[in-house]
């Protein structure tokens, strides 16, 4: 979508972890995981405007984060060395995905920047080269570059497409920010879940999140949100939190529950997607 001042708008959808298991700790300090990643239509909008002077400018960093530390800025900087010319860009972020929520908003913004600038700057990187680049920014970035619902392993960079039934999701965000680093270093965190032999949507059920019990213990507000949403369906935490979600087969059912919980919490009604909106552009 073109707007008056030459910026162009690009979507950056959120994700849910429908299943998340920690299968081991790596020597580099990261953890190996297995997870089902699902795209949803809750999304940020990334506005980009090309420059020909090599400058990268992020106009509205999120939450006081320095420009150089923002994932979108870092994504552009990382890709710039592959550009054919003196390429630059201006970036604006219209945030709709809540931060610190386990929905991958910052990672999705960064992935959108990589996908678009790879074309604009004529970098010529393949999807898997971009995925490798994205892994240096964060464990969720590769999935958004992959652009389809997936079973992820490794630290999240090994991806296999997965068919997920069409569902609607009610998402609630408790008034707390969960520290991912704190959860991953927690002594009682499950780190030895068995690896899946035949990972399919059906075979992995019942779904679980190995971080959930630790987060509930350390952040009672997340437990309260889980308890509330569990009154209406099978609730689960996404990522390392803080958001809790429940899946429904029909939009009307999801909407009715959304109306119930939106008076108590910051809440969202989202539709599952089969692929990244940029793949349709």
UniProtKB/Swiss-Prot annotation:
Keywords of the record, alphabetical order, are: ATP-binding, Isoprene biosynthesis, Kinase, Nucleotide-binding, Transferase
What is the scientific name of the source organism?
A: Neisseria gonorrhoeae (strain NCCP11945)
Which pathway features in its UniProt record? Isoprenoid biosynthesis; isopentenyl diphosphate biosynthesis via DXP pathway; isopentenyl diphosphate from 1-deoxy-D-xylulose 5-phosphate: step 3/6
Checking InterPro entries in the record gives: GHMP_kinase_C_dom, GHMP_kinase_C_sf, GHMP_kinase_N_dom, IspE, Ribosomal_Su5_D2-typ_SF, Ribsml_uS5_D2-typ_fold_subgr
Q: Name one GO biological process term.
A: isopentenyl diphosphate biosynthetic process, methylerythritol 4-phosphate pathway
Q: What is this protein called?
A: 4-diphosphocytidyl-2-C-methyl-D-erythritol kinase
- Source domain of life is Bacteria
Any one GO molecular-function label of the UniProt entry: ATP binding
The entry's active site is 15, 140
Its function, per the record, reads: Catalyzes the phosphorylation of the position 2 hydroxy group of 4-diphosphocytidyl-2C-methyl-D-erythritol.
Please spell out the taxonomic lineage of the organism that makes this protein.
Bacteria, Pseudomonadati, Pseudomonadota, Betaproteobacteria, Neisseriales
């Amino acid at each position: 979508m073109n707007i008056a001042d030459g910026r162009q708008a690009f979507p950056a959808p959120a994700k849910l972890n429908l299943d998340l298991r920690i299968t081991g700790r790596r020597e580099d300090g990261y953890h190996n995981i297995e997870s089902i990643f699902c795209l949803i239509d809750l999304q940020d909008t990334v506005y980009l405007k090309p420059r020909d002077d090599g400058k990268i400018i992020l106009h509205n960093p999120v939450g006081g984060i320095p420009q150089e530390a923002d994932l979108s800025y870092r994504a552009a900087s990382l890709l710039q060395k592959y550009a054919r010319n003196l390429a630059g860009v201006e970036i604006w972020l219209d945030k709709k995905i809540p931060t610190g929520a386990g929905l991958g908003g910052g990672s999705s913004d960064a992935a959108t920047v990589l996908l678009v600038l790879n074309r604009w700057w004529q970098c010529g990187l393949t999807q898997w080269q971009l995925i490798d680049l994205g892994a240096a920014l964060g464990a969720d970035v590769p999935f958004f570059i992959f652009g389809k619902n997936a079973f992820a392993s490794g630290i999240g960079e090994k991806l296999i497409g997965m068919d997920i039934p069409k569902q609607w999701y009610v998402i609630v965000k408790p008034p707390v920010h969960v520290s991912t680093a704190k959860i991953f270093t927690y002594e009682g965190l499950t780190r030895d879940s068995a690896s899946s032999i035949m990972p399919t949507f059906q075979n992995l059920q019942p779904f679980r999140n190995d971080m959930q019990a630790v987060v509930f213990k350390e952040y009672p507000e997340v437990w309260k949100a889980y308890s509330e949403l569990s009154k209406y369906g099978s609730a689960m935490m996404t990522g390392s939190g803080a958001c809790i979600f429940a899946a429904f087969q029909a939009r009307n059912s999801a909407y009715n529950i959304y109306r119930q919980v939106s008076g108590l919490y910051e809440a969202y009604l989202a539709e599952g997607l089969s692929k990244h909106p940029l793949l349709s552009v």
